[in-house]
């Protein structure tokens, strides 16, 4: 893990998976995630738990749904994940299951805002 001005580069699939689990466990209000069903299936229990305790969960995926979550069907880029928790933290990058996978994690408001806007635009397009 490498820190640069509020941005953390997370390298290796195991480290990324651990960070995602941690982010999901610490979600206070809402979660937005864009990823393939293959990636999201690894986090099924965490996602179901968030829905069960009343958190807002918005999923953009090719083939993944959870009852009571807001799900939008869309094409996804292979091995890509975009995750925003509580409008405060973002994780984006590649997770394919190997040690060379890399994700960027940040609580920097400018990156969070850019990512939120991108996901919002995608949701608006899917809703038309």
Task: Label every PLM stretch briefly.
Residues 1-49:
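PLD-like (HKD) phosphodiesterase/transphosphatidyltransferase domain
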Residues 36-128:
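C-terminal regulatory/effector modules of DNA-binding transcriptional regulators
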């Amino acid at each position: 893990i490498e820190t640069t001005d509020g941005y953390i580069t997370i390298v290796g699939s195991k480290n990324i998976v651990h960070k995602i689990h941690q982010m999901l466990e610490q979600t206070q209000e809402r979660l937005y995630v864009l990823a393939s069903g293959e990636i999201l299936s690894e986090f099924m229990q965490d996602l179901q738990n968030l829905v069960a305790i009343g958190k807002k969960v918005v999923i953009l995926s090719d083939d993944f749904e959870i009852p009571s979550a807001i799900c939008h069907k869309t094409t996804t880029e292979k091995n890509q994940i975009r995750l925003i928790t509580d409008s405060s933290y973002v994780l984006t990058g590649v997770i394919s299951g190997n040690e060379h996978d890399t994700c960027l994690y940040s609580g920097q408001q400018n990156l969070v805002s850019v990512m939120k806007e991108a996901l919002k635009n995608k949701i608006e397009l899917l809703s038309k």
